[in-house]
């Protein structure tokens, strides 16, 4: 006996009825969504480049790859780019605030890499505590300082913690010359960064619908 399925089995509408209209997504919303993803992919790409160039598995502070300075400069520029991305919606002051917070995020991460490289446990603990405190400050900025906010403090805190935890896994894998683990950690960082980018772009699009009308 043949099994016959109508389209209503998948849409949940009665046979012959008109399905509800799908929401129309404007080209400007798609462009913004993709641009935000590009910014956060730049963030993790240049962060990874810096991690590799630090050569954390070589316990000599004088040993780094020659591209470290250029990679760091590009990574710091990415923080400016991310801050600039929210200026059309939240203004220049808020954009500059986000850039400053993200600049500290990168600067402290550099301290962590240096401490890990030379095996300075005390310096690592100090920098790591400040790194997570800075992540909380970023979460507060996204959830409380911006008006309207991009999500709850709990959501933003979890997002930032996941980002730091995944990046730490990447550093630890390289420290231990665990190249398979390093690749797996980067895949995790990449997926998490895309989720973070989507959370931010979706929040802005929802908060400023007039700027993204079809």
Descriptions of predicted regions:
Residues 6, 16-56, 60-65, 72-75, ...:
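C-terminal amphipathic alpha-helix
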Residues 1-8:
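Sec-dependent, cleavable N-terminal signal peptides
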Residues 76-113:
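Mid-chain, structured segments of secreted extracytoplasmic proteins
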């Amino acid at each position: 006996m043949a099994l016959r399925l109508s389209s209503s089995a998948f849409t949940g509408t009665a046979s012959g009825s008109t399905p509800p209209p799908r929401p129309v997504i404007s080209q400007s919303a798609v462009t913004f969504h993709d641009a935000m993803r590009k910014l956060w992919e730049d963030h993790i790409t240049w962060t990874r480049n810096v991690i590799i160039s630090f050569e954390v598995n070589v316990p000599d502070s004088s040993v780094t790859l020659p591209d470290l300075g250029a990679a760091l400069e590009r990574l710091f520029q990415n923080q400016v780019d991310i801050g600039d991305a929210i200026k059309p919606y939240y203004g220049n002051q808020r954009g500059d605030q986000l850039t400053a917070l993200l600049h500290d995020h990168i600067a402290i991460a550099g301290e962590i890499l240096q401490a890990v490289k030379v095996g300075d446990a005390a310096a690592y603990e100090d920098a790591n505590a400040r790194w997570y405190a800075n992540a909380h400050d970023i979460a507060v900025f996204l959830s409380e300082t911006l008006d309207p906010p991009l999500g709850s403090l709990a959501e933003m805190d979890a997002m930032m913690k996941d980002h730091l935890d995944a990046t730490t896994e990447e550093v630890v894998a390289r420290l231990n010359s665990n190249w398979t683990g390093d690749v797996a950690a980067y895949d995790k960082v990449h997926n998490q960064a895309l989720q973070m980018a989507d959370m931010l772009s979706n929040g802005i699009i929802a908060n400023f619908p007039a700027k993204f009308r079809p």
